[in-house]
A protein has these predicted regions:
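Acetyl-CoA-dependent GNAT
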Residues: 8, 33-91, 102-103, 108, ...
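Conserved beta-strand-loop-alpha-helix junction that forms the acyl-donor binding cleft
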Residues: 93, 119-129
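Conserved GNAT-fold acetyl-CoA-binding loop/helix
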Residues: 15-44
C-alpha cells in the first residue's frame, strides 16, 4: 500500500468515497452528493505543501481512502490550527488504513507551522472516536443536536490534539 498526496486524477474516486458518506451516513452533514467538478475546489485547497494536505491510500491502482488537514476557520489567527478528517472506501473499513493515513498525515504536519489539530465527529461514532484517541486527541466539547440529517438531530463532539 502506498500513501501519497492526492492529485487531480484521484478526483472521481475521492468523490465516490465521500458521496457514500453523504448518502448513507450522518458522518458528514452534507446532504446532497457531489459531482467531481463540484469537489474540485476542495481538492485544489489541499496542495502538496503547507499545512492543508490531502493524502490518499492506494493499493493495486485502487484508492482505499484519504485523510485531510484543512483550514479550521478563515480568520488569520487560526492559521496554525487545522481540522483533520479520514474517509475510507466502505469496502476497506476495518483494515487499519485510517491509522496509516493519520500516521502519514501527522508526520507531514510535524514539518509545518501547525500548533493544533481538531476533529469534529458526528456522534455516535465509536470507530472514529477510538481512532482519534489513539492518535492523542482528547474530547474538548460536545455540541448537542447541531446537525439535522435523516429525520433526526445529531451531536458533534470536538476533539483536539496539540502538535
Amino acid at each position: 500500500m502506498e500513501i501519497r498526496p492526492g492529485v487531480e486524477d484521484d478526483l472521481d474516486e475521492l468523490t465516490r468515497i465521500y458521496n457514500h458518506y453523504v448518502i448513507e451516513t450522518p458522518i458528514t452533514f452534507d446532504v446532497e452528493p457531489f459531482t467531481p467538478d463540484q469537489r474540485r475546489p476542495w481538492l485544489l485547497a489541499h496542495p502538496t505543501s503547507g499545512p492543508h494536505r490531502l493524502l490518499v491510500a492506494e493499493e493495486g491502482g485502487k484508492l482505499l481512502g484519504y485523510a485531510t488537514s484543512s483550514a479550521f476557520r478563515p480568520k488569520p489567527a487560526y492559521a496554525t490550527s487545522v481540522e483533520t478528517s479520514v474517509y475510507l472506501a466502505p469496502e476497506h473499513v476495518g483494515r487499519g488504513i485510517g491509522g496509516l493515513l493519520y500516521t502519514s498525515l501527522f508526520e507531514v504536519l510535524a514539518q509545518e507551522d501547525v500548533h493544533t489539530a481538531l476533529a469534529g465527529i458526528a456522534m455516535p461514532n465509536q470507530a472514529s472516536q477510538r481512532l482519534h484517541e489513539r492518535f492523542g486527541f482528547r474530547q474538548v466539547g460536545l455540541l448537542e443536536q447541531v446537525g439535522g440529517k435523516f429525520d433526526r438531530f445529531w451531536d458533534v463532539a470536538w476533539f483536539q490534539k496539540s502538535l
